[in-house]
Structures are given as C-alpha cells and as structure tokens.
C-alpha cells in the first residue's frame, strides 16, 4: 500500500502488503481525490457488467450442458470452464461492494481469505482448462486414430479433477497470508506476507522492510505468472501453431475461419492477462517506476483480466459453427455449439441436437481434421 512516510508506522508496509488487484484491492493514494473517485466508479461499473454478463452467460452454459446435452469430452471442458467462471462471477459482488465503500472491508477475516482464494483458484482453473482444451484439439489433429480410441468422457473428468486440485494448491497461499486490519479508520483486506500483527513491534516499518515477507511476496507473484500465464500461453500458442501447420500441410483448411478463431483465442487470452501479470511483476521493484503508473495501470489491467471470465462463452461457444447467423435463436446456437465434438465445424446451426449428435458420431476422420479449430 502506498502511504506517505510519516504515516507508514501505522499502515501496511509496501513490501509486506501485496496489493492483489485481482480481488479489488486497489490503492489510490497516488491519485488526486477526483482521479481516485473516477477510478473507483469505473471499477464498480466494469465489475458489475462483467458480473452480470458472466453469471448470465456461464449460467446458461451450465444449465444447457447439464440438462440438455449429451455428455461428450468437449462438453466436460465447456462445463468445467463455465463453472469456474461462474464461481468467479458469483463472488464479484463482494468486491464490488468493497470498491464502492472506498475499500472498507466489512465481511470479516474468514471471508477475506475465502473470497480471494476462490478468485485466484478461478484464475488457475480457467487457465489450465483453456490449456487442456488447446492440447486436446492439437492431439485430435496430430493423432486422430489414437484420439478416436482413447479420448473418453471419463478421462476428461479425471483431467478436470486434477486441474481443480492443482489450482487448489496453487491458490492456498491466500488462505494463509490473507488478513484484515484497521488502517486509517478503514478495515483493509490484504496479503500479510510477514504474518505479523499490524502496529505490533514485529510489524516492519517503511525503512525496515521484512526480507521474509518480501521473499514470500516474490515467490507468490512469480509462481502466479509462470503457472497462471507464461507456461499456459506457450502451450496454447504451440498447440494452435501445430494445428495451423498440420492443416496447411495437408490442405485441409478450406476457409480462413479456423485461423481467425485461433488468432482470436490466443490474442484475447494474451491481452486479458498480460498487463495484469506484467504490472504485478514490475511492482516487485516498485521504486523504479512512479506510483501513479500502478495506481492507474493496475485497476485497468485488473478490469481487463476479470473480463476474461465473461468472454469465454463468446470465444468458445458463440464463435463456433455458424454462430453469426442472426436468424437462429440463442438457445439453439448454444445447443449447437456445445454439442460439437472436437474437430467438427461444418454442421448448419439450425439442425436439432438429436440429429447433430448422431452425425457427430458418424463423422469421418478427414472431417475431424478439416474442422479442427
């Protein structure tokens, strides 16, 4: 938290309080009162829009996938992705309230830990699911026969279980370090990496930054960057580049549409998360840059990052087969997209789910490669 030096003994030291902007911990002391107010209003508006669209879009996907669709491997991916994003959006109102109340936390220490844990857990779960979707599609293109024989719903559920457990462990620092404290008449929800009590003799001052707390801060930040962004982006990019090369070499791509979808998926994911992780890495060496860069940049980067939770239904469903045909009802479009098996992209969107399911099962290997996204 950026405080004036004379106030620092009664506040959270910068090296100890990790301003986790993903859950609305936005510190605006480097901004003018007007700028700070405008920024808070902006965040409340953006978070509210994301919350509404995310709950509506992901909720609709969950309902259709659970009650209307035949269980396929793709269905398992889409369902888990929607559940992860839905949980993220459900807890956004807490952080919308936090921002609206000028960052005064009224929900208690336990909820401070749990809410942040769920948000970070969603980040890892969503990223890992997007990665496994890309890997699954790549394998289906490179090894169609193996994929046909070994790709099963049971295996997909097992993979999702591993993803959720792995995300749990990577998010567990929030349950340990998350804390609340009364600072300047407000209750703050923050990361207390020194695990000391604010205001106590063990609480580090501005000139006496806790090296252990800073080390923990660095480990958490770098781990989130590597596991939650860099490695998944490299895998996703490699998968789709491999798919593009395979389709071009075999001359299976009849249109440019699959390539547009591939580019859109990669660029959108990169744009949503790159600013957030980059600024958090730079913040480890915050003295090298003006505080206003983080006060303005991190809220904007955070808004962009959380927007990914409501973009996924658009990118992975509405950009599917023939979704630009306005005459088709929304429900039919969702059913059509969610019933697609990996590699199918040539069915008219007005066909019924029953007919599509039977056709999916009879589709040849060549069609699977041709339509692979």
Curated annotation (Swiss-Prot):
Glycan-bearing residues: 9, 192
Key words, A-Z: Cell membrane, Disulfide bond, G-protein coupled receptor, Glycoprotein, Membrane, Phosphoprotein, Receptor, Transducer, Transmembrane, Transmembrane helix
All ranges on the Cytoplasmic side of the membrane: 65-75, 136-154, 246-261, 321-373
Residue pairs linked by disulfide bridges in the UniProt entry: 112-189
Key word ATP-binding present: no
Cellular component, GO annotation: membrane; plasma membrane
Region (Disordered), start-end ranges: 341-373
Record-linked InterPro entries: CML1 (IPR002258), Formyl_rcpt-rel (IPR000826), GPCR_Rhodpsn (IPR000276), GPCR_Rhodpsn_7TM (IPR017452)
UniProt superkingdom: Eukaryota
Polar residues bias locations: 344-363
Biased composition (Basic and acidic residues): 364-373
TM segment ranges: 42-64, 76-97, 115-135, 155-176, 225-245, 262-282, 301-320
Known role: Receptor for the chemoattractant adipokine chemerin/RARRES2 and for the omega-3 fatty acid derived molecule resolvin E1. Interaction with RARRES2 initiates activation of G proteins G(i)/G(o) and beta-arrestin pathways inducing cellular responses via second messenger pathways such as intracellular calcium mobilization, phosphorylation of MAP kinases MAPK1/MAPK3 (ERK1/2), TYRO3, MAPK14/P38MAPK and PI3K leading to multifunctional effects, like reduction of immune responses, enhancing of adipogenesis and angionesis.
Identification of the protein by name: Chemerin-like receptor 1
Organism for this UniProt entry: Homo sapiens (Human)
């Amino acid at each position: 938290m950026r405080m004036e030096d004379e106030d620092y003994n009664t506040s959270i030291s910068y090296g100890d309080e990790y301003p986790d902007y993903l859950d609305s911990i936005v510190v605006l002391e480097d901004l003018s009162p007007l700028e700070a107010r405008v920024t808070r209003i902006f965040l409340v508006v953006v978070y509210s829009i994301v919350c509404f669209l995310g709950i509506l879009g992901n909720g609709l996907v969950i309902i259709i996938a659970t009650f209307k669709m035949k269980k396929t491997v793709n269905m398992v991916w889409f369902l888990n992705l929607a559940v992860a994003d839905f949980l993220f959006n459900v807890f956004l109102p807490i952080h919308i309230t936090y921002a609206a109340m000028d960052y005064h936390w009224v929900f208690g220490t336990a909820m401070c830990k749990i809410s942040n844990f769920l948000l970070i857990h969603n980040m890892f779960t969503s990223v890992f699911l997007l990665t496994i979707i890309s890997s699954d599609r790549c394998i289906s293109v490179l090894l169609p026969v193996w994929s046909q024989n070994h790709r099963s719903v049971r295996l997909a559920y097992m993979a999702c279980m591993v993803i959720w457990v792995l995300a749990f462990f990577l998010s567990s620092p929030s349950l340990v370090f998350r804390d609340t404290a009364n600072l300047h008449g407000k209750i703050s929800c923050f990361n207390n990496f020194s695990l000391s009590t604010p205001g106590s003799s063990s609480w580090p001052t501005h000139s006496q930054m806790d090296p252990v707390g800073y080390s923990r801060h660095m480990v958490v930040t770098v781990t989130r960057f590597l596991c939650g962004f860099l490695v998944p982006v490299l895998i996703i990019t490699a998968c789709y580049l491999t798919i593009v090369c395979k389709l071009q070499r075999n001359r299976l791509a009849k249109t440019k549409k699959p390539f547009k979808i591939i580019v859109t998926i990669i660029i959108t994911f990169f744009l949503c998360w790159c600013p957030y992780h980059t600024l958090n890495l730079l913040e480890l060496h915050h003295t090298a840059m003006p505080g206003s860069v983080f006060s303005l940049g991190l809220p904007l980067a955070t808004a962009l990052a959380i927007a990914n939770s409501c973009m996924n239904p658009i990118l992975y469903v509405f950009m599917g087969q023939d979704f630009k045909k306005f005459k088709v009802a929304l429900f039919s479009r969702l059913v059509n997209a969610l019933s697609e098996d990996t590699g199918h992209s040539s069915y008219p969107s007005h066909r019924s789910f029953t007919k599509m399911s039977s056709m999916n099962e009879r589709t040849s290997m060549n069609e699977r490669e041709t339509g692979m996204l």
